[in-house]
Curated annotation (Swiss-Prot):
There is a cross-link at Q632 (Isoglutamyl lysine isopeptide (Gln-Lys) (interchain with K-?)). Disulfide bonds join C230-C370, C370-C371. The modification N6-acetyllysine is found at K468. The modification N-acetylalanine is found at A2. GTP binds at R476, I477, R478, V479, G480, D481, S482, M483, R579, D580, L581, Y582. GO terms for biological process: apoptotic cell clearance; bone development; branching involved in salivary gland morphogenesis; cellular response to cocaine; cellular response to dopamine; cellular response to serotonin; dopamine secretion; G protein-coupled receptor signaling pathway. This is Protein-glutamine gamma-glutamyltransferase 2. Disulfide bond formation inactivates the calcium-dependent acyltransferase activity. Cys-370 can form disulfide bonds with both Cys-230 and Cys-371: formation of a disulfide bond between Cys-230 and Cys-370 facilitates formation of the disulfide between Cys-370 and Cys-371, which promotes inactivation of the acyltransferase activity. May also form interchain disulfids between Cys-230 and Cys-370. Ca(2+) protects against disulfide bond formation and inactivation. Belongs to the transglutaminase superfamily. Transglutaminase family. Keywords: Acetylation, Acyltransferase, Calcium, Cell membrane, Chromosome, Cytoplasm, Disulfide bond, Extracellular matrix, GTP-binding, Hydrolase, Isopeptide bond, Membrane, Metal-binding, Mitochondrion, Nucleotide-binding, Nucleus, Protease, S-nitrosylation, Secreted, Transferase.
């Protein structure tokens, strides 16, 4: 009788498997695999080698606290002649004496998470069990049988592997790209993402069921949407929108997700202060990409927050056009969420592909502050019965806006406002380039098209179907040049009378600082004049906005809302026009000193010219970049920076990965907040 087969050790082939599974950056000390794909391991036996005629090898793979075959969290499989794609299986690749090389495969629908892999070796009546090691299983966008399969290699690299990108802010007329370090492969981030799944209330309530359901990216996307905010659980970020961030970090100051996720883990899963929509979206993007789900951050300009699902945002104003009160139903200057790519077997055919997921806590969905995933195609088609939260997302891009002017007797009159259209310039980063891609067409049919009317009819969007009133008088807000921080500048109310009648009007122009979510701040410029509009004439009325007026009340959004209200007393009519202005921050210049080689020290010199007429105090540069720095670095500049002078600092870098990387920089001081910059750095081999 053959002697017992004893295992000496197991080589999980971490580096080789990491290269094959596009997880090399994660495979420093642990094996990280993508499901549905073959991987290799090598067994070293003591005394004698494996003999197929007398030895039997059976493998076990388990995940979660209470694994079971029924839940899909436990598997037993024997060595076979060939690896079976799409199931737990193993076969021999090669044998040299006591060394056995094996090939194994996981199912394309296996739950993701941490697995323990074991081996039972039996010879006759003798048998021994061995723990071969642990591995982490992720979703696989390269596997056609996986629910997150994406058939474009360029898109897989952008939406799964790329660690830096852009988030779009500013205003619909001045779109601002903000660099962001997603850093999904940075040290400790994968463990933090798995911890996030284990902290979600569904896991704490029923651990076995939650682990089983992690096979579905739909389920995991919904969990991540809830866990990135902390409104119902021990989630990552606490939201705040009142411009008081003294006991935390301003949402505008963040430049990446890595620091946020590390803070959350290091402080015992306590909320990180503070986030706003793009921070929630960026952290969700990091987590979902890390878990293997193709994901991108999306910005919707003029985004509606409709609480009662009537697809209508109503503003009530006094006779001067001023809002009677700030309210929860608002038009946000912009709003960010993420889209993740997956199949939707729970929905009708055609609703697979990009799914909107919104982690910003706005409204509850099934009792939890989360939103989505909802098919972007379903939004475009106006199919509001689609899971999950289709009415809310449809309203974000399609709601109508009505302005009511309250009269002296308390009655209200409807004002005409052609300047505010919800759901414009929906933006995301282009694939493989540092450019913006407009994806509005994926959410909406062209304005005025028969398809648009059909969608509005299906969605019962009666207000959008109503005929628009025409008066023959039009007004829009135009801007001049030099809309930069520290400058005085002019804006103009451009008024056209396209009728044969003379119109006697009163124009009220007002500029106020505004937060990106539509909450107004103090006034920083006004004009009140009487106008005679001649037949078929055009007029342009300027409003001067002074730095001394806006400097003390501008929020970190750098936004000013200009409102024009044209009143025609004889006709008792009101015409409203608005425009949000974004004030450009000064440019951060970045120089890289030294030869950019792997594992060789580099120095980044960052500088900024003070554009203001006042000195700058408390200046600080913060930099980070996946593959360039292990952690975020900050440099304080103690001396005041006189008007027109440069503020400059140097930061040491130690690049560990070859290829293209982005160094992301933030600058803060007493008078300039959240100035962003970046530089692409190509690191060559040592």
């Amino acid at each position: 009788m053959a002697e017992e087969l004893l295992l000496e050790r197991c080589d999980l082939e971490i580096q080789a498997n990491g290269r094959d599974h596009h997880t090399a950056d994660l495979c420093q000390e642990k094996l990280v695999l993508r499901r549905g794909q073959r991987f290799r391991l090598t067994l070293y036996f003591e005394g004698r080698g494996y003999e197929a005629s007398v030895d039997s090898l059976t493998f076990g793979a388990v995940t979660g606290p209470d694994p079971s075959e029924e839940a899909g969290t436990k598997a037993r499989f024997s060595l076979s002649d060939n690896v079976e794609e799409g199931s737990w299986s193993a076969s021999v690749l090669d044998q040299q004496d006591n060394v056995l090389s094996l090939q194994l495969c996981t199912p394309a629908n296996a739950p993701i998470g941490l697995y323990r892999l074991s081996l039972e070796a039996s010879t006759g009546y003798q048998g021994s069990s061995f723990v071969l090691g642990h591995f982490i299983l992720l979703y696989n966008a390269w596997c056609p049988a996986d629910d997150v399969y994406l058939d474009s290699e360029e898109e897989r690299r952008e939406y799964v592997l790329t660690q830096q990108g852009f988030i779009y802010q500013g205003s619909v007329k001045f779109i601002k790209s903000v660099p962001w370090n997603f850093g999904q492969f940075e040290d400790g981030i994968l463990d933090t993402c798995l911890m996030l799944l284990d902290m979600n209330p569904k896991f704490l309530k029923n651990r076995s069921r939650d682990c089983s359901r992690r096979s579905s990216p739909i389920y995991v996307g919904r969990v991540v949407s809830a866990m990135v905010n902390c409104n119902d659980d021990q989630g990552v970020l606490l939201g705040r929108w009142d411009n008081n961030y003294g006991d935390g970090i301003s949402p505008m100051a963040w430049i990446g997700s890595v620091d946020i996720l590390r803070r959350w883990k290091e402080h015992g899963c306590q909320q990180v202060k503070y986030g706003q929509c793009w921070v929630f979206a960026a952290v969700a993007c990091t987590v979902l990409r890390c878990l293997g789900i193709p994901t991108r951050v999306v910005t919707n300009y003029n985004s509606a927050h409709d609480q009662n699902s009537n697809l209508l945002i109503e503003y009530f104003r006094n006779e001067f056009g001023e809002l009677e009160s700030n309210k929860s139903e608002m038009i946000w200057n912009f709003h960010c969420w993420v889209e993740s790519w997956m199949t939707r077997p729970d929905l009708q055919p055609g609703y697979e592909g990009w799914q909107a997921i919104d982690p910003t806590p706005q409204e509850k969905s099934e009792g939890t502050y989360c939103c989505g995933p909802v098919s972007v195609r379903a939004i475009k088609e106006g199919d509001l019965s689609t899971k999950y939260d289709a009415p809310f997302v449809f309203a974000e891009v399609n709601a109508d806006v009505v302005d009511w002017i309250r009269q002296e007797d308390g009655s209200v009159l409807k004002s005409i406002n052609r300047s505010l259209v919800v759901g414009q310039k929906i933006s995301t980063k282009s694939v493989g380039r540092d450019d913006r891609e407009d994806i509005t067409h994926t959410y909406k049919y062209p304005e005025g098209s028969p398809e648009e009317r059909e969608v509005f009819t299906k969605a019962n969007h009666l207000n959008k179907l109503a005929e628009k009133e025409e008066t023959g008088v039009a007004m829009r807000i135009r801007v001049g040049d030099s809309m930069s921080m520290g400058n005085d500048f002019d804006v103009f109310a451009h008024i056209g009378n396209d009728t044969s009648e003379t119109r006697e009007c009163r124009l009220l122009l007002c500029a106020r600082t505004v937060s990106y979510n539509g909450v107004l701040g103090p006034e920083c410029g006004t004009e009140d004049i009487n106008l005679t509009l001649d037949p078929y004439s055009e007029n342009s009325i300027p409003l001067r906005i002074l730095y001394e007026k806006y400097s003390g009340c501008l929020t970190e959004s750098n936004l000013i809302k200009v409102r024009g209200l044209l009143i025609e007393p004889a006709a008792n009519s009101y015409l409203l026009a608005e425009r949000d202005l974004y004030l450009e921050n000064p440019e951060i210049k970045i120089r890289v000193l030294g030869e950019p080689k792997q594992n060789r020290k580099l120095v980044a010199e960052v500088s900024l010219k003070n554009p203001l007429s006042d000195p700058l105090y408390d200046c600080i540069f913060t930099v980070e970049g996946a593959g360039l720095t292990k952690e975020q670095k900050s440099v304080e500049v103690s001396d005041p920076v006189p008007a027109g002078d440069l503020v400059k600092a140097r930061v040491d870098l130690f690049p560990t990965d070859i290829g293209l990387h982005k160094l992301v920089v933030n600058f803060q001081c007493d008078k300039l907040k959240s100035v962003k910059g970046y530089r692409n750095v190509i690191i060559g081999p040592a």
